[in-house]
């Protein structure tokens, strides 16, 4: 196999040392030139990085997106010069010498923490500690799922590994334990994590706050563990550990690699000062002397260059072999091949939108969480990459795909993922699934208020263009008796403030279907669907097309785009807006009702369209939403009124809270009379 070929050409002796030192000095020089960055980790992890990229991993540097590549995640994202140096040596066009010299500068392809959308070859965006290892669990889940679903006894078409380097900081974060607990439970045998055990944290030696036995904890989580005691020069030990890890196919492996942070620096090695700042000219010189490195800055010695140059033809050959294998597979298993292809490319089957349910005002009213389940189940039949689940609330979030079983260790082809009560890990795992292949459409669910437990991962979804669908139910005081700990208030506006994420709050069946259409189409932008626990009617005038515009008129008894009053609402309050409009019309007023499903989508429409919905000449405007009023001023204007909730909720039947908090038809009518 390819791995053996690569290992057969491994660098040894002097060339190996030279190659590893090249990695170290590219990192040192880039950090020094930027006068900013983290040299310590790349200096300490260069040996394991070298073994992975030069001897073990399968990839094609000229096509960073080849489907069956091994994935590498640098969870300790601050050490990104390690990865940039490796991508540069391996021949990726995304990291040329000039890019290394532009490390951490405006517009460069080598940002201060790895960003998948900036640098082809970087799989996921890391930096907030713990996110990367959790993303890697998602990548490994995706591989295990596709392998179980598409491999045949005579054709292993999906077969790649996920490698991670994580540090002490990642290990301390709760998200890492959540995700690694699931990885052990799922038996993700193709996930191999290297724990850079260097005993240094930013505030000093890890003795000050981190003294647990990490390996024993991982064994308890169901991982295989190995300890490489000399990560600085123990190349054969690193190689043997990887071989052993691959032989254990039913468990993920943690390889604890004890390293010296800043290895080679005579005065700063093994100190926290080498973690996050440049060595300084004097210490760089001392390190050059110490490691016997007589070369100029950013220099790659000829023999090192020529040794690494083989990855370009070998990578092309690996991909060509796989393509030939896939062509054979296609002949034998045409249907499966077509499905797998759509997950690989992200091309949705024609007519998938027609699968979404349609509703009329006569359809029986229902909670939008239940309508969401109808949409999810309809989509699961036509969107092959739809996969997901809930943080132990599937029966409350209504996210079960009824035609599939549970994704488990021995039933990895199934599409219901049981995340357990692990919101943060769930979000980051879904990011990994989304970024594995363009045709994956992962969704995850909990109560909307508990997005507070997963915001770190949701922000990374938005930043890294991971099209995760967040199915967030129990979206307001409308959930009733569970009270203020469970009732979202500030959540809608907080996500509207977050860049590159769609906040959708549908009011009924057609709007829920529209929200799903938007969410599935936005593969580079995550979506949050805020859904009700309480039953709502299907309103006249709502539509899928309207949702796509973010805000649209559902009823209007005026002419010439000049109503006396505009009432806008979202979700469960749209019904209240519509009822109030009916009352006001009986009194002779002309009233327009606007459904405002998504601020972001509305803001993206043309000025003409916005004027057709919210004409500037009409200043009598009212908004109603069971959440914070912050931000509504933008749409109701200086003369308008925003009805909402700017305090915590309460424990009582939902109807009572609505009344006590003034989220009512009467409040709208009173506000209308004040104009």
Curated annotation (Swiss-Prot):
Any Pfam family matching the protein: Transketolase_N
Residues the entry annotates as binding substrate: 275, 369, 396, 474, 482, 533
Location in the cell: Plastid, Chloroplast thylakoid membrane
Domain of life of the organism encoding this protein: Eukaryota
EC number: 2.2.1.1
Protein name in UniProt: Transketolase, chloroplastic
Protein source organism: Zea mays
Gene Ontology MF terms: calcium ion binding; cobalt ion binding; manganese ion binding; transketolase activity
Job of this protein: Catalyzes the reversible transfer of a two-carbon ketol group from fructose-6-phosphate or sedoheptulose-7-phosphate to glyceraldehyde-3-phosphate to yield xylulose-5-phosphate and erythrose-4-phosphate or ribose-5-phosphate, respectively.
């Amino acid at each position: 196999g390819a791995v053996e070929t690569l290992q057969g050409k491994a660098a040894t002796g002097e060339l190996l040392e030279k190659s590893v030192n090249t990695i170290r000095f590219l990192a040192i020089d880039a950090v020094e030139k930027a006068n900013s960055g983290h040299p310590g980790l790349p200096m300490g992890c260069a040996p394991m990085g070298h073994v992975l990229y030069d001897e073990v991993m399968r990839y094609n540097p000229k096509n960073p997106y080849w489907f069956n590549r091994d994935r590498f995640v640098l969870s300790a994202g601050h050490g990104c010069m390690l990865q940039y140096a490796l991508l540069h040596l391996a021949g990726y066009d995304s990291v040329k010498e000039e890019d290394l010299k532009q490390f951490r500068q405006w517009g460069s392809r080598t940002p201060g923490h790895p960003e998948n959308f900036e640098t082809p070859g970087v799989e996921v965006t890391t930096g907030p500690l713990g996110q990367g290892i959790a993303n890697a669990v998602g990548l490994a889940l995706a591989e295990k799922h596709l392998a179980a679903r598409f491999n045949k006894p005579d054709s292993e078409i999906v077969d790649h590994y996920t490698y991670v380097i994580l540090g002490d900081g990642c290990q301390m974060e709760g998200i890492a334990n959540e995700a690694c607990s699931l990885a052990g439970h799922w038996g993700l045998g193709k996930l191999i994590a290297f724990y850079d055990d260097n005993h240094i944290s930013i505030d000093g030696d890890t003795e000050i706050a981190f003294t647990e036995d990490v390996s024993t904890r991982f064994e308890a989580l169901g991982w295989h563990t190995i300890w490489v005691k000399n990560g600085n020069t123990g190349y054969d030990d690193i190689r043997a550990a990887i071989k052993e890890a691959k032989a254990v196919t039913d468990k993920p492996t943690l390889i604890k690699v004890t390293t010296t942070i800043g290895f080679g620096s005579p005065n700063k090695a093994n100190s926290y000062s080498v973690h996050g700042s440049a060595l300084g000219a004097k210490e760089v010189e001392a390190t050059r002397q110490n490691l016997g490195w007589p070369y100029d800055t950013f220099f790659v010695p000829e023999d090192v260059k020529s040794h690494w140059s083989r990855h370009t033809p070998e990578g092309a050959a690996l991909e060509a072999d796989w393509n030939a294998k896939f062509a054979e597979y296609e002949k034998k298993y045409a249907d499966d091949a077509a499905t797998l292809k759509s997950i690989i490319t992200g091309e949705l089957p024609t007519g998938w939108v027609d699968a979404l349910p349609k509703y009329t005002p006569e359809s029986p009213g229902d909670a939008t969480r239940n309508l969401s389940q109808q949409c999810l189940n309809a989509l699961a039949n036509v969107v092959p990459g739809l996969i997901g689940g809930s943080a132990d609330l599937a029966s409350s979030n209504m996210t079960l795909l009824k035609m599939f079983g549970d994704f488990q260790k021995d039933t990895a082809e199934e599409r219901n993922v049981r995340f357990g009560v692990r919101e943060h890990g769930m979000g980051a795992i879904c990011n990994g699934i989304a970024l594995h292949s363009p045709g994956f459409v992962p969704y995850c669910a909990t109560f909307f208020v508990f997005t507070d437990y997963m915001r770190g991962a949701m922000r990374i979804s938005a930043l890294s263009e991971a099209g995760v669908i967040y199915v967030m139910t129990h979206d307001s005081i409308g959930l009733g008796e569970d009270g203020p700990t469970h009732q979202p208030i500030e959540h809608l506006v907080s996500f509207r403030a977050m860049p590159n994420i769609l906040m959708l709050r549908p009011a009924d069946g057609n709007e829920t279907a529209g929200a799903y259409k938007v969410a599935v189409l936005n593969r580079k932008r995550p979506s949050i669907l805020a859904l009700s626990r309480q039953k709502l009617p299907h309103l006249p005038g709502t539509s899928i097309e309207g949702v796509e515009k973010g805000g649209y008129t559902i009823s209007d008894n005026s002419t010439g785009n000049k109503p006396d009053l505009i009432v806008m609402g979202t979700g469960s309050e749209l019904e209240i807006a519509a009822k109030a409009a009916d009352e006001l019309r009986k009194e002779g007023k002309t009233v327009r009702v606007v459904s405002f499903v998504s601020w972001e989508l509305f803001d993206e429409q043309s000025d003409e369209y916005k004027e057709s919905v919210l004409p500037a000449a009409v200043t009598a405007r009212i908004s109603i939403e069971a959440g914070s009023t912050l931000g509504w001023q933008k749409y109701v204007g200086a003369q308008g009124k925003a009805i909402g909730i700017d305090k915590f909720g309460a424990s009582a039947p939902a109807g009572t809270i609505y009344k006590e908090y003034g989220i009512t038809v009467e409040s709208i009518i009173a506000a209308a009379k004040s104009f």
